[in-house]
């Protein structure tokens, strides 16, 4: 039996998903494909790496296989006993570009196991199992957006998700005449995981000082309690980024794509100066694009300290500057960026 789960890109709402905020992701037309069959021991094979991991019992491997092992362990916590299986994995989602290859692997694994063993897990169960696998087993304390987008997405729509309540609505992606790209900076700075966890701690500290249990209850008035400084900058980003998500949803519904470009630039400036998670390479890409005709908007995507930049451009405009950007980026940083044109996609599904 074969299934596939898509990667995702988040149009806007960065570093808000673990702060009870709003996000606006959509699944992309790049997938993790997974084939499952019976076996006498757990066996996980990656076609991309040409690597096989065999386990007689479910334990940590400190490899890509941990995403699958973590999912199986989370399913077993819910009272199911999973017999050994062989799982073959193939993926065309770029790793490290902020397109959620790990969430797609988790969602594909949970869905495949549910279907194969007839567990009838709901999509929301699959999302929660996948997120808990990453937090509890892999050890990355992520939000829930990536897994949610990989499971629930619908082609030609973005998901407006409230990460506090998990209420969501589909918002039409009316992009006629426009294109979406992600530019992979091909850098990943060492700070990424330590600074990500530090940002989470800073947000929790700010809430403690303010005396509220969620950023959704924080008002502008509350900001005075932070007495300026780093924590104020972090909270300002979260509050303003939530507002930008709401404005972007409105603009999408009203077919005002150009307005969205402005919100993307504002989001990047906020991630650069208030949340302080961008880097020279992604800043360079966004600054370069700002000056160019036909580019509507751009911002860094993902956790930061490298990774990708999302771009909305008028049809045909981006290709005309791609080579110039590549050359200028190379002369500045000594590496070449990678460009991906993205289309929206449905969420996890069986492959016929």
UniProtKB/Swiss-Prot annotation:
Species the sequence originates in: Thermosipho africanus (strain TCF52B)
A Gene Ontology term for the protein's cellular component: cytosol
UniProt keyword Nucleotide-binding present: yes
Pathway assigned to this chain's UniProt record: Carbohydrate metabolism; galactose metabolism
Catalytic activity: alpha-D-galactose + ATP = alpha-D-galactose 1-phosphate + ADP + H(+)
Protein origin, superkingdom: Bacteria
Annotated positions binding substrate: 14-17, 196
Active site: 146 (proton acceptor)
Designated name of the protein: Galactokinase
Enzyme Commission number(s) from the entry: 2.7.1.6
Principal cellular location given in the protein's record: cytoplasm
The UniProt record lists the keyword Zinc-finger: no
């Amino acid at each position: 039996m074969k299934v596939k789960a898509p990667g995702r890109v988040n149009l806007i709402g960065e570093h808000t998903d673990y702060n009870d905020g709003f996000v606006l992701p959509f699944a992309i037309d790049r997938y993790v494909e997974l084939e499952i069959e019976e076996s006498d021991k757990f066996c996980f094979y990656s076609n991309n790496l040409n690597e096989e991991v065999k386990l007689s019992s479910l334990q940590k491997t400190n490899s890509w296989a941990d995403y699958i092992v973590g999912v199986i362990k989370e399913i077993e916590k819910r009272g199911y006993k999973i017999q050994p299986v062989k799982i073959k994995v193939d993926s065309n989602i770029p790793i490290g570009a902020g397109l959620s290859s790990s969430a797609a692997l988790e969602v594909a694994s949970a869905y495949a196991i549910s279907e194969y063993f007839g567990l009838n897990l709901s999509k929301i169960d699959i999302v929660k199992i996948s997120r808990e696998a990453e937090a509890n087993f892999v050890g990355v304390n992520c939000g829930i957006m990536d897994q949610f987008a990989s499971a629930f997405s619908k082609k030609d729509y973005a998901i407006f998700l409230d990460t506090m309540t998990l209420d969501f609505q589909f918002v039409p992606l009316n992009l006629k005449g426009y294109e979406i790209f992600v530019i992979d900076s091909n850098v990943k700075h060492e700070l990424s995981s330590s600074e990500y966890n530090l940002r989470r701690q800073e947000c929790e500290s700010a809430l403690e000082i303010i005396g509220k249990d969620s950023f959704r209850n924080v008002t502008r008035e509350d900001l005075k309690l932070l007495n300026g400084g780093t924590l104020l900058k972090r909270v300002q980003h979260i509050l303003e980024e939530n507002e930008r998500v709401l404005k972007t949803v409105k603009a999408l519904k009203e077919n005002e794509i150009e307005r969205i470009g402005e919100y993307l630039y504002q989001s990047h400036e906020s991630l650069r100066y208030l949340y302080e998670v961008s880097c020279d390479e992604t800043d360079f890409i966004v600054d370069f694009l700002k000056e160019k005709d036909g580019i509507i908007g751009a911002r860094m995507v993902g956790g930061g300290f490298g990774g990708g930049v999302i771009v909305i451009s008028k049809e045909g405009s981006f290709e005309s500057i791609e080579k110039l950007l590549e050359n200028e980026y190379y002369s500045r940083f000594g590496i070449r960026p990678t460009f991906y044109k993205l289309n929206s996609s449905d969420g996890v599904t069986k492959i016929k």
